[in-house]
């Protein structure tokens, strides 16, 4: 008798995706982050659901409702901090996942890569709207500053901003709609993850060498399920440690002050995971130029498959491009640091240099180094 997991219409899909999936035998721990992102998404949806049961999306009570969750709800403080720090873990895994994709040439699977970029944009939008919900000072002013950027769009900018706000400033209507979108988007993300996996399993996983691995594949279960479970334990341990020992480490103290439209914080900045993009935005003196640079800082990932000039897929055997890659990583860390600094000399200049270098590495240095390597290895 054939096993039910191979015949049942529903189990068959799960079996082909997580059990009998042919997987390259040499994929490293850098391939763990896909499953870790899945765990992060589940944690965020569950904790978010419990928070939504007690949260009120009204400007007069939003801040108090978050205080109420932390003080009066059973383990409310734990749920709240799991959700807030879970977002940070989500972005750490996300950045490593994208970084691994760039390093090992996974972007040559164009459909999977493009769905991934859309997912990245959607997750960033969700996180931004979630940051507005506690209605602290940084929530309010962050929402005001970031939504105001849309006013840089010619002709329709101001109308568009007022339409998003639901009035002439960030107010009750804005908070209510942000809560509605913040609630629904994770489920849309979950659906898009299915599409991402669908495209991935169409061609199969890449591997560290970047070579065709059809001759050497092993079933996903038990080999990679065990490997993923280890990663999940490490992730949960890190998250729990962060929540229990330093819950406010990655937050902003200004967000413990209720939102006040009459008092601007001395330094408005988003959460740490947006700082690199925020630094790129600030480094362009022109408003519209800054907005375009901000969007391009993520959208530039979509042109990677078209800038791909090497005969070798992975950077494993390409030391020159490896150098450019790690230069890019260092540059993103510098941008993250600059995004959290005040707008004054020398931070402005460092930000402008780092932003220019960011785009230059991706568009100019990496493709050129690939051509040089091909020439040196006589690959042409």
Swiss-Prot record:
Membrane-spanning ranges: 33-53, 77-98, 113-133, 178-198, 226-246, 288-308, 320-340, 347-367
Positions with a binding annotation for heme b b562: 83, 182
Protein's membrane topology: Multi-pass membrane protein
Native organism taxonomy: Eukaryota, Metazoa, Chordata, Craniata, Vertebrata
Cofactor(s) annotated in UniProt: heme b
Record's cofactor remark: Binds 2 heme b groups non-covalently.
Primary role: Component of the ubiquinol-cytochrome c reductase complex (complex III or cytochrome b-c1 complex) that is part of the mitochondrial respiratory chain. The b-c1 complex mediates electron transfer from ubiquinol to cytochrome c. Contributes to the generation of a proton gradient across the mitochondrial membrane that is then used for ATP synthesis.
GO cellular component entries: mitochondrial inner membrane; respiratory chain complex III
Organism, scientific name: Steatomys parvus
Family membership noted in the UniProt record: Belongs to the cytochrome b family.
CDD domains (UniProt xref): cytochrome_b_C, Cytochrome_b_N
Residues annotated to bind heme b b566: 97, 196
Gene Ontology molecular-function annotations: metal ion binding; ubiquinol-cytochrome-c reductase activity
Entries under PANTHER family matching the protein: CYTOCHROME B
Alphabetical UniProt keywords: Electron transport, Heme, Iron, Membrane, Metal-binding, Mitochondrion, Mitochondrion inner membrane, Respiratory chain, Transmembrane, Transmembrane helix, Transport, Ubiquinone
Protein name (database record): Cytochrome b
């Amino acid at each position: 008798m054939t096993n039910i997991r191979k015949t049942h219409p529903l189990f068959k899909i799960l079996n082909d995706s997580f059990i009998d999936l042919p997987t390259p035998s040499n994929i490293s721990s850098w391939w763990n982050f896909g499953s870790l992102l899945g765990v992060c998404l589940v944690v965020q949806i569950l904790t978010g659901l419990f928070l939504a049961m007690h949260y009120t999306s009204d400007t007069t009570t939003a801040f108090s409702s978050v205080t109420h969750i932390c003080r009066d709800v059973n383990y409310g403080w734990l749920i709240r901090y799991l959700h807030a720090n879970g977002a940070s873990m989500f972005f750490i895994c996300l950045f490593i996942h994208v970084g691994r994709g760039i390093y090992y040439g996974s972007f040559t699977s164009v459909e999977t890569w493009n769905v991934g970029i859309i997912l990245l944009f959607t997750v960033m939008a969700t996180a931004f709207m979630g940051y507005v919900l506690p209605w602290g000072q940084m929530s309010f002013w962050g929402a005001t500053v970031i939504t105001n950027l849309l006013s840089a769009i010619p002709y329709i900018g101001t109308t568009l901003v007022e339409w998003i706000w639901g009035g002439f400033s960030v107010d009750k209507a804005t908070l209510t709609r942000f809560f509605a979108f913040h609630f629904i988007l994770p489920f849309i993300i979950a659906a898009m993850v299915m599409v991402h996996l669908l495209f991935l399993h169409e061609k199969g996983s890449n591997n560290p060498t970047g070579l065709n691995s059809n001759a050497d594949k092993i079933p996903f279960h038990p080999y990679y399920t065990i490997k993923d479970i280890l990663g999940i334990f490490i992730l949960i341990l890190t998250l729990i440690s962060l929540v229990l020992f330093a819950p406010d480490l990655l937050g902003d103290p200004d967000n413990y002050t209720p939102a006040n439209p009459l008092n601007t914080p001395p330094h408005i900045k988003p959460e740490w995971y947006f700082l690199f993009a925020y630094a790129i935005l600030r480094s362009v003196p022109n408003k519209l130029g800054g907005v375009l640079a901000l969007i391009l800082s993520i959208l530039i990932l979509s042109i990677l498959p078209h800038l791909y000039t090497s005969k070798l897929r992975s950077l494993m055997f390409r030391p020159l491009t490896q150098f450019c890659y790690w230069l890019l990583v260092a540059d993103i860390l510098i941008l993250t640091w600059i995004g959290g600094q005040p707008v004054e000399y020398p931070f402005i200049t460092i930000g402008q240099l780092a932003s220019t270098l960011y785009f230059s590495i991706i568009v100019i240095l990496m493709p050129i180094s690939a051509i040089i390597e091909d020439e040196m290895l006589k690959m042409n």
